[in-house]
């Protein structure tokens, strides 16, 4: 994600988007729970990095638990013009089946708006997401 911004530690990056990144002397290592306007379910993932994102006007997620783009911020990731960038590792799409469905729909409909997507069962992935939420974030399970 960092490469697509304006700069990394004041060195030029690709400058596709207006954000910049700064390397830090500390590491951010934590489990994270996020929300997004794109889907109703929670996003789960894991952070392991030593940089922060600055000047983010188009966040992808809102942090519920865990670190956002920086330790003092609740915004995380970046989305604009069909670009989705995040610091989360996970694997993100496998651990979040509703976000996977959203992402695949967006990807396909961007190129072929009339394409009919065949329904695919993600029952095991959905069960894994529910179990993780129940085991680690039970206060957010309805």
Residue ranges, per PLM feature:
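Catalytic beta-strand/loop cores that center a nucleophilic Ser/Cys/Thr
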Residues: 36-81
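Hydrophobic/aromatic beta-strand patches that form the interior of the parallel beta-sheet core
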Residues: 15, 46, 84-86
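Cysteine-nucleophile active-site neighborhood
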Residues: 1-40
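Short, acidic Gly/Pro/Ser/Thr-rich loop/turn segments
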Residues: 21-24, 52-55, 91-95
């Amino acid at each position: 994600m960092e490469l697509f911004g304006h700069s990394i530690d004041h060195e030029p990056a690709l400058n596709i988007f207006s954000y910049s990144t700064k390397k830090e002397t500390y590491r951010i290592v934590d489990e994270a729970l996020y929300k997004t306007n794109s889907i109703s379910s929670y996003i789960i993932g894991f952070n392991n990095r030593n940089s922060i994102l600055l000047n983010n006007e188009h966040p992808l997620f809102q942090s519920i638990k865990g670190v956002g783009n920086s330790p003092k911020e609740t915004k995380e990731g970046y989305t604009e013009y069909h670009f989705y960038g995040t610091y989360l590792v996970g694997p993100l799409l496998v651990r979040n089946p509703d976000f996977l469905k959203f992402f695949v729909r967006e990807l396909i409909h961007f190129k072929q708006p009339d394409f009919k997507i065949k329904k695919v069962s993600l029952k095991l992935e959905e069960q894994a997401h529910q179990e993780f939420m129940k085991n680690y974030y039970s206060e957010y399970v309805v």
